């Protein structure tokens, strides 16, 4: 969906964030998540809700890796730094059956509160308490990068003389990286 087309009928913008951390190019994963957060914030020019995140490992990627220590806190604070008013989870308690029984959760099958994942979720909550004055605030961007979802779809679906090496999203990310490089 092109969320911008729904901005006038939405009460709140939310999205589900499941970056593929712990790959060779970690920086690009971080930049992509950052760009997606900024896109969500730009829809209504106000804070959004991070509706779903996973404190440990997902169940549906080619390789499902447990986040390294501290990574969940970093990813959560990244969302807040880019306009999220929340860090919410799918799922609170790990499912008993079906495919999501292998999807990470705040409370795993063991059920205790003495796991690393549970401790790290607690750390996120404590960090958010310390910065609660940021809730509802927004920032004014100094630069803009246009991401046209319909253009992305059109290029992805093109059937013509050149069908390879047309990477719209990667081109937008490259421009986005150049802009954030200037900001830091």
Residues covered by each model-derived region:
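Carbohydrate-binding surfaces of carbohydrate-active enzymes
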Residues: 7-11, 15-184
């Amino acid at each position: 969906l092109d969320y911008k087309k729904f901005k006038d009928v939405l009460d709140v913008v939310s999205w589900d964030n499941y970056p593929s951390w712990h790959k060779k190019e970690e920086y690009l994963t971080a930049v992509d998540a950052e760009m997606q957060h900024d896109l969500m914030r730009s829809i209504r020019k106000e804070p959004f809700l991070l509706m779903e995140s996973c404190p440990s490992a997902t169940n549906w990627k080619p390789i499902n890796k447990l986040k390294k220590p501290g990574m969940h806190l970093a990813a959560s604070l990244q969302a807040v730094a880019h306009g999220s008013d929340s860090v919410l989870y799918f799922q609170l308690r790990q499912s008993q059956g079906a495919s999501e029984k292998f999807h990470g959760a705040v409370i795993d099958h063991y059920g205790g509160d003495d796991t690393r994942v549970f401790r790290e979720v607690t750390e996120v909550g404590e960090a958010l308490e310390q910065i609660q004055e940021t809730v509802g605030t927004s920032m004014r961007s100094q630069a803009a990068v246009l991401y046209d979802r319909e253009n992305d779809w059109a290029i992805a679906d093109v059937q013509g003389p050149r069908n390879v090496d047309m990477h719209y999203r990667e081109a937008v990310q490259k421009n986005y990286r150049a802009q954030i490089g200037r900001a830091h």
